[in-house]
Structures are given as structure tokens and as C-alpha cells.
């Protein structure tokens, strides 16, 4: 049987669903969703942890046995992102960082120039860097060349729920990548997560689609099932698309 574990850098995870924590109504709701998702890796906005003390969220993740993945959400330049990552390493005792460098607050799209600059500095400083990036195969390759442990292209802008608006680009990123590809941002429902895996992504990272769903725990369970289904379908190999019909049973 094919090993279904997700491996990034020197760590392996049984679940290919990575969860975010933003948007949850409260810790009780978040806990139910995290348990239902089966996730083993969950992002934590280090700026929010600093502002709110963070003990409740971090204690929750520790109790559930979930690895926290600090991110640099809200950073607008390489210098700010690097400093935030260094603070996260000191606070959480981890050299893993989800790197986000945002161009503006309206689109929340990555600033490609500052993103690469920050990635290069963090890799040189010994970080395991997982960058949130545009759905640009050239930029993804540039980040891999910089030493990033994975690339995390968006499906569509953060929080939009628009799904994967450019599946061909995601396929090109997958085809050219020598590191894991994690679909990050834009997931709206379970079919989006399944499609990401069918396109060849190694994992899916999502938050809003679960935390702001009508029933977060139920949606988390649906996302987990969708990621598994998409992964299995990709491994199984879909039939080729045809222009004309073809009978499944031969004529007598």
C-alpha cells in the first residue's frame, strides 16, 4: 500500500489537512473543529498570540497533541516578516515558519519581491520555511530554489471561498515542484479541497471555510474526508477525458 503520510522537511504527518485558527468564534468551537478535522499541524498567527497572551490557544493545541505552525500573518515587508519569525522561534521553540508577506490589506495577496527576499534570509538563518505564495509557477520555483521546504500557492484570495480559480497553474506548480505543494487559501467547501488533491497537491491548508461555516465541526470532518478522497483519487488515476461517449460494456 502506498504510504499516505505527508512529509515536509524532516517531519511526517498522518493527516494531509493543515488547519488555521483564524475566525473561530471561541476556543470551544475551535477545539471541536480541530478534533473533527484530524489535523496534526495548525497555524498560529504569532502577532495575535503576542497581543492576546496566546496561552489559551497554545494550551489547546498542546492538549490535543497538535503541532503549532507559527506564521507571519499581517507582515508587509521582508524585514517585518523576518523579525516576526525570529520572535516566533524564541517564543514557541520551533524553527518552522509559515511565511506570509502581504502586499495590501484589500487583496491580501503575497508581495512576490518581499516574499522571496524574506524566504532567502530565513533559510539562511536556519528556518524551515513554508511560504504562502501566488499561483505562479515561476515564483514557486524561485522559492524552492531559495531553499523553502514546501510551496503554498493560493487557490484564490484569503477568505473569499472562491475555490481554485486557476487549476491549470496549480497543476503546473505541482509538475515543476521538487518539494511538497500545499494549497493555501480560498477553499470554500469540501469539493474545493478534493480538487486540490486531485490536481496533485500534497496537502491543503484552510481556516475560514471551517471556522466560519454554519457547523464548523461538521465542515471540518467534511474537509478531512475530501482531502483523503482527493488524494486517493489522484493515486488511483482518473480516466482520460473524451470528447465522444464510450460505452462501458462492449457491444455483443
Curated annotation (Swiss-Prot):
Binding-site positions, 1-deoxy-D-xylulose 5-phosphate: 159, 185-186, 207-208
Coiled coil: none
CDD domains from the UniProt entry: ThiG
Catalysis: reaction(s): [ThiS sulfur-carrier protein]-C-terminal-Gly-aminoethanethioate + 2-iminoacetate + 1-deoxy-D-xylulose 5-phosphate = [ThiS sulfur-carrier protein]-C-terminal Gly-Gly + 2-[(2R,5Z)-2-carboxy-4-methylthiazol-5(2H)-ylidene]ethyl phosphate + 2 H2O + H(+)
UniProt-annotated catalytic positions: 98
One Gene Ontology term from the biological process aspect of the record: thiamine diphosphate biosynthetic process
SUPFAM superfamilies: ThiG-like (SSF110399)
Enzyme Commission (EC) number: 2.8.1.10
Record InterPro entries: Aldolase_TIM, Thiazole_synthase_ThiG, ThiG
A Gene Ontology cellular-component term: cytoplasm
Pathway annotation from the record: Cofactor biosynthesis; thiamine diphosphate biosynthesis
Subcellular localization: Cytoplasm
GO MF annotations, alphabetized: thiazole synthase activity
Keywords, sorted A to Z: Cytoplasm, Schiff base, Thiamine biosynthesis, Transferase
Homology family: Belongs to the ThiG family.
Quaternary state and interactors: Homotetramer. Forms heterodimers with either ThiH or ThiS.
PANTHER family registered for this protein in UniProt: THIAZOLE SYNTHASE
Role: Catalyzes the rearrangement of 1-deoxy-D-xylulose 5-phosphate (DXP) to produce the thiazole phosphate moiety of thiamine. Sulfur is provided by the thiocarboxylate moiety of the carrier protein ThiS. In vitro, sulfur can be provided by H(2)S.
Name of the protein in question: Thiazole synthase
The species this protein was found in: Mycolicibacterium paratuberculosis (strain ATCC BAA-968 / K-10)
